[in-house]
Amino acid sequence: MHLSPQEKDKLLIFSAALLAERRLSRGLKLNYPETIAFLSFQVLEGARDGKSVSQLMSEGTTWLSKSQVMEGIPEMVDEVQIEAVFPDGTKLVTIHNPIN
């Protein structure tokens, strides 16, 4: 299997996000890498599902709460930026203050 660097990045994000989802379902709090992977994956999947950049930016502030991440993580993650493929091309999605 030959994958481009971008495809390898997406697979890594998927793996880390899957781990994060499993830990959340067990009631564990996410650390920094898991938090970033979880949010990034939600953006990538939302774009794949046909959501707009503005929808994802708005929804992105509802995916995680402070109670779901380790202490100090909300302050560390003041924004998340990820390039996602939309039907009309690749766009940068920025979520400001994603953890409420």
From Swiss-Prot:
Its EC number is 3.5.1.5. Its main location: cytoplasm. One of its GO terms (molecular function) is urease activity. The keyword Nucleus does not apply. It is found in: Cytoplasm. Keywords: Cytoplasm, Hydrolase. The keyword Acetylation does not apply. One of its GO terms (biological process) is urea catabolic process. Pathway: Nitrogen metabolism; urea degradation; CO(2) and NH(3) from urea (urease route): step 1/1. It catalyses: urea + 2 H2O + H(+) = hydrogencarbonate + 2 NH4(+). CDD domains: Urease_gamma. It comes from the Bacteria. Pfam families: Urease_gamma (PF00547). One of its GO terms (cellular component) is cytoplasm. Heterotrimer of UreA (gamma), UreB (beta) and UreC (alpha) subunits. Three heterotrimers associate to form the active enzyme. Belongs to the urease gamma subunit family. This is Urease subunit gamma. It comes from Prochlorococcus marinus (strain AS9601).
